[in-house]
Amino acid sequence: MIKDNISLWMTVFFVDQYAIDLNASAAFVLFIPIVGFLGRIAYPMLNKLCKNQEYKLASRAFILCIVASVILLSKAISPIVAIVCLSLIYAAISVVNTVFLSVFPLQYAKNGNQSSVSGIMDFFTYMGAGIGSLCYGYMVSWFGYFAMFLSYAVVSVISVIIMEKKIIRKNS
C-alpha cells in the first residue's frame, strides 16, 4: 500500500508542494525506485545483520518508515530531504515486501503450498494497493499530503507492534 502510493502520488506531490514543473518532477522522483531497488539488493546483507530473523528485519524496516514519515510531516523540509525520506520509505517497504512476498511463502514449500500462499499474498497485496490508491486520492484531496504521511507513520507503528509480538511469541 505505502510503496505503490509513493509511486503513484509523488510526482504530483513535488509539483504541488515545491512548485517543481511536471517534467522536472518526473526526473526528480526517478531517484525513488532506484533506491527501492537498492533496498531489494541489500536484503541478503540486512537479513544476515538481523541473524536471519525475517520479522526482526521487517520491524526494523518499518521503524525506518516511521522516522522518514515523521520527518515528512514537517512542512519546512527541502525537496531534497523529501526525496531522501520518500526513497528510504520505498526501500524499506521493498525489504518488507521481499520478506512477506518472497521469503515467507517459502516456509510452505515442504507442504507443497508455496504457490498457493504466494498467490494469495500477491492478490491481497494488489487489492490493498488498489484500495489504498483510492483512499489516498480522497485523503490528499480533502486533507493534503500531511494526512498521507501521517497514515504511513501510523501503519508502520502498527506493523512494528505486530512484528515485535511475533518476535516475542517466536522466542518464547
Summary of predicted features, one role per range:
Residues M1-R40, N97:
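Extracytoplasmic gate region of multi-pass secondary transporters
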Residues V12, T98-Y108:
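Intracellular helix-loop hinge segments at the cytoplasmic ends of transmembrane helices
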Residues G39-N52, V140:
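Helix-to-loop junctions at the C-terminal end of transmembrane segments
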Residues I41-M45, L134, I161:
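Residue-level hotspots within transmembrane alpha-helices of multi-pass secondary transporters
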Residues Q53-F100:
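C-terminal transmembrane helical hairpin of 12-TM major facilitator-type secondary transporters
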Residues Y108-W142:
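A late C-terminal transmembrane helix in Major Facilitator Superfamily
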Residues Y136-S156:
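A membrane-interface helix-boundary motif in multi-pass transporters
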